[in-house]
Amino acid sequence: MCIRDSFPKAYAFIPFKNFFVRRFLSSKLRSIDNIESYQKIFENLVEKVINQSISSFTCNGLEQLDTNHSYLFISNHRDITLDSALLNYALYKAGHKTFNIAVGDNLMNTKWVADLMRLNKSFIIQRSGATKKDIYKGLSLASEYIHELINKNESVWIAQKQGRAKDGIDSTDPALLKMIHLHKRKEFSISEYFNELKVVPVAVSYEYDPNDINKAIECAKTNQGKDYIKSSNEDISSIAKGITDKKGDVSINVGSPLKFVSDDSDQISDQITKSIRNLYEPHSTNYAAYIKSKNEILDHSFSESKINESINYLESRAMQLTKHEKEELYSQYYQCLIKKMGG
């Protein structure tokens, strides 16, 4: 099966105009007929993203992992596609097998996106349904599939909660852990099961978030009790901006597999959250946002010129925003500092 032939109309709809993605995919998609050939193109594509939209990319901690073992990577979530794509790329280059990616069913509404997601070892977490029974069935199937993958010595990546952390607060949802445990809850306690899965915490951080303005507008509305209505193509637009727009320095820090003692899902989620927050590597924009919002300076290792550059960047982003939206913009950048300090 040629992926281009399977959805020719959708192919013409790819929203990566005036950039490399459309040109690159135009010449390469014809050769895709299996996961391996896609992942070779995926490698080249991620390298182009890094070379053309990222100033510096680092991934630390992979030496703690065994290339012969499978893991459950639980990550914070800032960008719809790049969080997992960049880590998968780093693993691939370090000699590890690439992982399977858990994605929400909201990304399956556009056919070409759905096809590409599935081909790149992605599977759906079905969170919606006509009845509670339908939802439970979908979550049970996802739980069973995660177990099946790990049992076959294949790794899995999943975000620590549903959706991106648009407010900049990285927290692990206990309900996510209960969903993962669902399939084996009668055989193993939750701590036993998660120790068996070998949970690895992951923190990804971006100097510049291409979707920061949209996130600020949404958070300002919801925090004021107003309804935020997502447009039909909003997720697709976010994917395109996240891939093509400048991101500055990008860091991924990978922790060692966690050991759990408690059988309380809240305590397990707190342990994962703390690990991810400790791993998070702040950038100059995080400190600049704190200065803009709090008029205080926290200790950091960046030069004065770098901080001023970041302040200018944030001010340019905030120019088009209302007072409440500006504060949400700054907040999404500095929250990581508050949380690392235990706030």
Show which residues each predicted segment covers.
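Membrane-interfacial terminal anchoring regions of lipid-handling membrane enzymes
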Residues: 1-71, 77-83, 88-97, 105-111, ...
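Flexible glycine/proline-enriched surface loops and loop-helix/loop-strand junctions
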Residues: 162-163
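Conserved nucleotide-cofactor-binding alpha/beta core module
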Residues: 100, 104-136
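Acidic beta-strand-to-loop metal/phosphate-binding motif
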Residues: 159
